[in-house]
């Protein structure tokens, strides 16, 4: 039996370092190191810890004593990924942010103003036309390439697939996997993309791909994830949001035929952090070429204080599936939760490193650790883990495919190798306190402007449906009371009437539970997943 090394947990369970015990160091082997970029996270941590109170230091000491291995494993930040940048002549298009930023227009008052908001001068977008016949992923028009942040030396890889239906009118969707530190190309080839990778390395057509009625962009972010790379690092969600705005702005500038169509951000897991912040960043720019219409968060981590309370019920048979843990383990989790909740509350109050890191370490060990040690799949309570570190053998098939030289050449990948998940990134985010920060507080502002869908497969443990339903009902916003009172109704496939889940909706807020779906709903329930997406994008649940 294999113990699951959850992407959402592996870094968190070993990601912090007590300042009084360890000295954070750089890795010994660096390629093209820009030391100032790598020193920023350490400097920020040092500055945050200067204000460490006696009470906070006692908390650090307490959690470090309880879980010493978790604190000892993060003395190093990750090493930059080896890469070779291609000459500009090898790309079909290059969009320079400085050129976009230099365009001025006259407003209604006769005053000159920039056509598009934002700080874009440091960004470029490189674009490659992908020949569909070379790889056989899909027959539709495809583009891949990099968003380059020349100031911070960051390079984010993307892969765009046009809609199979009506690309001139169909919406555009951005897909983000979580981790933090897992490649969105996993989502492409394992969940919602045009094809999946089989054990023999061959591709299998996906009839339920989300590009059935929408064009989809898969983005490897943050840097040093998948085909993306940097000599520096990103270790918090807010910093990553600036990159997303630049990517979309330059992409839609190069391809204006997509810019007027409805645009939606979707993702799963730690994307429950990313998506509210990324959407808020886009909406903060009033002069933009991004027609953001909604967001979709699948089995996300968004409000830790509410969600962590529901690990014990899900593990102990109260989530609709048989119990995974015995009574003594369930009782131990009950006993541990009050301390966990207290630590998260402290994090919510200060949003500082010194309060948020101990909360993550304690709560992940106390509330997720007992389940993880059983060897059961943290992404699906019905199954044991497979041989892969992340429980699914399909991840190995995908990695092998994306490491083929002909594949990397076809899409213009510049890194020496592809990894599905980078656990160092996971630890970096936690070490900066990002893990437990209250990003759900951004959601009420989003609901003022756009619809928000939170969906969850009902067999997931790591970001389970109980916790996701609970945080949406606890969220304070102007439609809170009406949403909380809204009843769950059957969600059925149009045509045959097959029940595939339940849904509740009020105002701009919708929650959906997908039956027999794990952490990755499109993987477990592809038909129900596409039904959900098609009907959501059509505006069926919006008010």
UniProtKB/Swiss-Prot annotation:
Residues 1-17 form the signal peptide. InterPro entries: AB_hydrolase_fold, Peptidase_S10, Propeptide_carboxypepY, Ser_caboxypep_ser_AS. One of its GO terms (molecular function) is serine-type carboxypeptidase activity. Keywords: Carboxypeptidase, Disulfide bond, Glycoprotein, Hydrolase, Protease, Signal, Vacuole, Zymogen. The keyword Disulfide bond applies. The active site is at residues 269, 460, 519. The keyword Protease applies. Glycans are attached at residues 213, 508. Residues 18-128 form a propeptide. It is found in: Vacuole. It catalyses: Release of a C-terminal amino acid with broad specificity. Disulfide bonds join 182-421, 316-330, 340-363, 347-356, 385-391. Belongs to the peptidase S10 family. This is Carboxypeptidase Y homolog A. It comes from Phaeosphaeria nodorum (strain SN15 / ATCC MYA-4574 / FGSC 10173) (Glume blotch fungus).
